[in-house]
């Protein structure tokens, strides 16, 4: 089973990585093509395109300018440790064991607007480029057109390498839309996390994002390999709802949200 998650806007390049192991992103030719195009934009154009403040637009213009295809532990950091935010708070990669990192490297992928698809130990230089960005390019009107069926094909290869055909989708709709289902040779398992509020179970974004990270961690640490085993997930009060679930759409409920 292969798990996919979204990246994060928040990055941490200050905290030293907990492992010295690293690999290089596999699709840097694609990333470089995007960088070359992004370098042609002024900070004001970046601000308008990405709906960023002037300060953030300037920061990302500088990032695009200093980006280099030569990745080292000095100018880059392992993706799973560089991303921060709700999903990655739940995943808590800093406290994974070396064996956990090895398992994650084969069974976890991060979708990315700039890098397409990242493995946990792939070095990543800092960037901001959300998958939903309407960056017109030679392949079409946006990043979905740019990546086309490539991400699906890479996921197919990763699944083939482990002799499996189950893809666990713990990514947001924005990012999983970059996976072309028609080109994907996999059974997709979707998951919802619902918290009780005012007597009803609802998807609450903050909690759901963190839960996606917690389930990713659960899969890694417990070496989960089948959809049925996912039903054992019970972190921080969540429990499987057979009543609300379907074979390829699992629902987990929580009665009393906790931070």
Swiss-Prot record:
InterPro entries with a match to the protein in the record: YaaA
GO BP of this protein: response to hydroperoxide
Where does the secretion signal sit in this chain? none
Q: Name one GO cellular component term.
A: cytosol
UniProt xrefs under Pfam families? H2O2_YaaD
- PANTHER family, A to Z: PEROXIDE STRESS RESISTANCE PROTEIN YAAA (PTHR30283:SF4), PEROXIDE STRESS RESPONSE PROTEIN YAAA (PTHR30283)
Q: Which NCBIfam families match?
A: PRK02101.1-1, PRK02101.1-3
Question: What family does the database annotate?
Answer: Belongs to the UPF0246 family.
What name does UniProt use for this protein?
A: UPF0246 protein Pput_4436
């Amino acid at each position: 089973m292969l798990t996919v998650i979204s990246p994060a806007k928040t990055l941490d390049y200050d905290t030293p990585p907990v492992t010295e192991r690293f690999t290089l992103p596999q699709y840097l030719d694609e990333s470089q093509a995007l960088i070359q195009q992004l370098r042609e934009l002024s900070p004001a154009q970046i601000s308008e395109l990405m709906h960023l403040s002037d300060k953030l637009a300037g920061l990302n213009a500088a990032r695009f300018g200093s980006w280099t295809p030569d990745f080292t532990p000095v100018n880059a950091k392992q993706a799973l440790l560089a991303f921060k935010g709700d999903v990655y708070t739940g995943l808590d990669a800093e406290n994974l064991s070396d064996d956990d990192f090895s398992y994650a490297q084969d069974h976890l992928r991060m979708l990315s607007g700039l890098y397409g698809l990242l493995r946990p130990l792939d070095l990543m230089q800092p960037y901001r480029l959300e998958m939903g960005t309407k960056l017109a390019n030679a392949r079409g009107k946006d990043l979905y057109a740019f990546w086309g069926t490539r991400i699906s094909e890479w996921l197919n290869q990763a699944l083939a390498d482990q002799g499996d055909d189950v893809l666990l989708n713990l990514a947001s709709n924005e990012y999983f839309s970059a996976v072309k289902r028609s080109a994907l040779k996999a059974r997709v398992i979707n998951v919802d996390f619902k918290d009780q509020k005012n007597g009803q179970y609802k998807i609450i974004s903050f909690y759901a994002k963190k839960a996606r990270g917690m389930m990713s961690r659960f899969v890694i640490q417990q070496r989960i390999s089948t959809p049925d085993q996912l039903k054992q997930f019970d972190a921080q009060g969540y429990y499987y709802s057979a009543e609300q679930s379907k074979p390829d759409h699992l629902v987990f409920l929580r009665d009393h949200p906790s931070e």
